Every structure is written in structure tokens, then in C-alpha cells.
Amino acid sequence: MVGRGSFSSTSSASSINWIPKNTKTSIESVSNTISLSENGQNQDLETVTTKESNVGDSDTTENIKSPFNGQWPFSRRSSQSSSHPVFEETHWSKHSKRPGKLNVLTPTSPSNVNAEVQSISTKTQLSLLNLSPHKHKKPKDGLDLSALQKTLNGSRNFLRGRRDAGGIFGASIPQSLVTNQIINGFGAASLAFAKLGKVRSPLEGRFNLVPISADETWLIVESEVCSLYSGEALHYSLEDLNGILILHLQALIRDTKMNEFVGHLETLFRKATKCLSDSLSPVPEELFLNRIIETWLFFFSSVLPYVQGVFLPIKTKLFDEQEKTQLPYEVNEFCSTNREKLNVHRLALMTFRDYMVLPIANRIQICIGRAESAENALDNAGEVFARLFQILSLLASVRTNDSKEQEITNLATKVRCLLIAS
């Protein structure tokens, strides 16, 4: 039991009496005598002498030898105002358990405890910093699409109000989209693209999107698609173009002009295909069929996949079953009615047929007639006509139920008969 002036620890075998001394702050040494009394007799066992440095107004600590490996888990602090026993600021730590070693309790000084607490606090702060979603994000050339990817692949906030979703992306187009090189290289689309750089305004570390007209966004898409048909490289990635096309779709729906989108697509592919047809005009007759095959391979293997990638949001945003629930009823009706007209793959093939092959059908028939009249003509040009038949057959598979479909079918039949006759 702890008293005000003394501390005693009793047992059936021994009794330890400890009497505090009134000490001041500057004490060089303190001697404590521990007496052990047994059967009414006190015997002096040992005297433990401890020294303590003079540090300000710090109290004097007595270290008493005890059965606890020479350390007491608590000690007595004496002061001028109170003689109550005070627990020592010694923290007992348990070593980690390792095979072949015993778990030993060792005291830790207050200074070490403070250092450990500070170290743990620092590690906690660092761990919180490591939770940042941008820590492992690698820098990327061109557009930073963290907000765009969150919208396209994450929550379904497509075409919601700006107050609810902060625009189509959740956030707006990053500033990295707009560079002088891109603006200067766009020509007719430069003004529209420059306006994209002005629609961003900072708000709590994010960016809101100011509405852009459909004409401004479409100029950019049109310029890039025409560049593909001309054999030029894209000015920026497909992800950027997907984002701009989504802006265009949102502007059309906001202005209730979705019915104009089909006309935009038809005009675009007609204009782009004209770039290919112009390249066949100066070609001589003996190289004409070879140039047609080369142009087709370029279109089918290089242009068409990228064009489908540019217009991917048409499939993922207008015809996706989950995304359709976020669209207005009128938009869903329009898309279901014009599904074939919004099929970019079909539209590109049909435009290639109508504005690339059919205008030169007469020249193709002349080449076929020359091959039929010449002896052993297919020995040298057999592979060329075989490839031509593949091209015409694929274009004839585009069903439009009009005279153009019938004309390309007849042309494919003539080439097939030539191959069979040989």
C-alpha cells in the first residue's frame, strides 16, 4: 500500500522499507540504505550510490537495485511540494520474437521514446503522402487524361449537366492539349483549337468546362481525318480525338442538333476520299491497276483502323447499353433509327466505293477488256486481277440496295469471269 511519506513492499519472507530524503536540485550524490528485516532484526544488505547531473529544476531520481534485472518499473521522485510516489517515465518495450532468442523487457529512456514517437509520426505522414493517386502516374507527352479516363472507364456521367459532372470529362480538357505547334499546324482548325485552351478556369484544383459549339470541335476532327487520308501523321493521340469527339456529341445534344451528325459524317468521308481519288489521275494505264491496289492497301490497313479509333465514342457512348440509360429519349430514338448511317466502318467502305472506285470504273473495264484480248495477259497480271477481285467483292458486300451496289457487283463479276476463263 502506498503512503504519503513512505513506500513499503511486504511479503511473507521479507520487508523492504524505503525512506525518501528531501533533496534540492543541485545534489552530487545520494546514498540510500536498504534494510532487510527478518524475524524482527534489521540487516544492512547493501548501499547503492547513484549520481545525477544538475539539469535545471529536474528532480533527483533514485535507482534502487531490485529483483527486476536491476531495474524498478517505477521509482520515487521527491520534491519540495509533494512526497507522493510518482511513476518513472520509463517505457518498457518488448523485443520482436525471433527464433532462438528470448523475449526480454528492456526500458527505454524518455528521450528515446520521444525520438520513436517523432519517427512514427514522420512515417505516418509519409505513408499518407504515398496514398496520393498521382504518385505512380508517369508523365505523359501530350494530353494528361486522368480526368478523361475516369469518365470514359469509370462512373457513368456522360452528357450530364456541368453542375453535376463538371462537363463530360468530370474535368475539362487539360492545358497540355494546347501547344503552339498544334495550333499553328491545324490551319482552318487553329481558331477552334485555340478556343479549347480558353475554356479552362481553376476552381479548387479542378477545371470546369465552358460550352463549346459543335462547329468548333468538328473542325478539329475533320482536319485530323483528312490528314489520315492524305498520309500524314496525327497531330495528337487517339485519346485526345476521342475526347474532342465527345465534346462534339455533347454540344449536338445540348443544342438538339443530333440529326446533323449523319450529314457531318457523310461530308467528312466524301471530302477525305477525294484526296485518294486525286492521286490516281496522273497514273498511266499500264500502272493503273497496281496503283489501285496500293491505294486500297493503304486505306484498308492504315487509314480505316485509325478512323474507327477516332470515332470509337460513337459506339461506346451512343450504343452502349449502360450509357444509353443516361441519354435523352430523343437521342436514343435517333441512334436506333440511324444505326447503319452511324456505322463508321460501313460508311468508310461505302464512301470508298462511291467516290474512289466507281468514278474510275470505266478505266477498270478498259483494263479488263485489254486483258481478255491479249494472249497470255494473265500470266503477268494474274495476281493483280486476283487482288482486284478481292477489293471489288469486299466493296460489293456493303448493302445499300441502289444502283451503285449493282454497278460494283457487275464489275466484280467481270473480273471473276476473267480469272475463271484464264
UniProtKB/Swiss-Prot annotation:
Statement: the UniProt record of this protein carries the keyword Nucleus: yes
UniProt-listed GO biological process terms: meiotic cell cycle; TORC2 signaling
Record's GO cellular component terms: cytosol; nucleus; TORC2 complex
Cited Pfam families: HbrB
Modified positions (Phosphoserine) in chain numbering: 109, 132, 201
Keyword Nucleus belongs to the record: yes
Primary role: Component of TORC2, which regulates multiple cellular processes to control cell growth in response to environmental signals. TORC2 is required for cell survival under various stress conditions. TORC2 positively controls G1 cell-cycle arrest, sexual development and amino acid uptake. Positively regulates amino acid uptake through the control of expression of amino acid permeases.
Protein name: Target of rapamycin complex 2 subunit bit61
Gene from which the chain derives: bit61
